[in-house]
Amino acid sequence: MLTKKPEINTILQATPDPHSLPAAMATEDLHVYYGDNHAIKGVDLTFPENKVTALIGPSGCGKSTYLRALNRMNDEIDGCRMEGQILYDGININRKEVDLYNVRKEIGMVFQKPNPFTKSIYENVAFGLKRHGMKNKKEIMERVEKSLRRAALWDEVKDDLGKSALSLSGGQQQRLCIARAVAMQPKVLLLDEPASALDPISTSKIEDLINELKNKYTIIIVTHNMQQAARVSDYTSFFYLGEVVEFSGTSELFTNPQQKQTEDYISGNFG
């Protein structure tokens, strides 16, 4: 548990109000239920384009449930239902008639534990492309290379593309999962504790990668690590008991929180 606020090793400047920037996604009055359990309670959040937004809060506060709601992954859970709007490109995607396959192509996700397919490194990245109808081998190879480069993995695997993805280290597997997601050319990347199972060196590589990827993608990351949130994010939202307590620029939230619950959490007084 932290006993002091995360250090912000940059010159503090006022972060623009997220509502003043072009939005990649937003939720309006979003509720998520697991049976009778009201897990997310009327959350309104806006995610600016090409920025990193961190979702923080104690275990069980609802941040991962909220993240999974953004590309409708909660639909796969029996007894889960959602109310309210999930806006992507200004369209509410929380509707039955929405094509979830296309939603998850546009809004990619990387999970806490690396989950490569039991296929070759090449096939892990190419698989989704083929499923979406790409047939030209040259085009597929170009997209595979481009995606592996964006995930900072190409130089490490370019001579071993035929090897099993399971032969890679944990950090390499997670970057492969990121490459697999970006190969589909999403606009938004959802990262659920992407470095929590990795060693410090691999974690540093993932964080460097996040800073690179935001030039092309909007990134929303769940993390228990407040130091990590301070390092990689532009905006931070503090969740508690299924509600957003505070949402602001990361520097402002960690150095001048406006809510006592936020202050207590980042100071290590609860959570």
From Swiss-Prot:
Give the way it sits in the membrane: Peripheral membrane protein
Family designation: Belongs to the ABC transporter superfamily. Phosphate importer (TC 3.A.1.7) family.
Catalytic activity of the protein: phosphate(out) + ATP + H2O = ADP + 2 phosphate(in) + H(+)
Where is the ABC transporter domain positioned along the sequence?
A: 25-266
What main location does UniProt list? Answer: membrane
One GO BP annotation is: phosphate ion transmembrane transport
Q: What does this protein do?
A: Part of the ABC transporter complex PstSACB involved in phosphate import. Responsible for energy coupling to the transport system.
Q: Which PANTHER family match?
A: ABC TRANSPORTER I FAMILY MEMBER 17 (PTHR43423), PHOSPHATE IMPORT ATP-BINDING PROTEIN PSTB 2 (PTHR43423:SF10)
Q: Which GO terms describe its molecular function?
A: ATP binding; ATP hydrolysis activity; ATPase-coupled phosphate ion transmembrane transporter activity
Protein name per Swiss-Prot or TrEMBL: Phosphate import ATP-binding protein PstB 2
A GO cellular component annotation here is: plasma membrane
Q: Which InterPro entries match?
A: AAA+_ATPase, ABC_transporter-like_ATP-bd, ABC_transporter-like_CS, P-loop_NTPase, PstB-like
Keyword list, A-Z: ATP-binding, Cell membrane, Membrane, Nucleotide-binding, Phosphate transport, Translocase, Transport
Q: Which organism is it from?
A: Listeria monocytogenes serotype 4b (strain F2365)
- Manganese listed as a keyword: no
Q: How does it assemble?
A: The complex is composed of two ATP-binding proteins (PstB), two transmembrane proteins (PstC and PstA) and a solute-binding protein (PstS).
Q: What is its EC number?
A: 7.3.2.1
Q: Where is the signal peptide?
A: none
Give the location in the cell. Answer: Cell membrane
Enumerate the residues binding ATP: 57-64
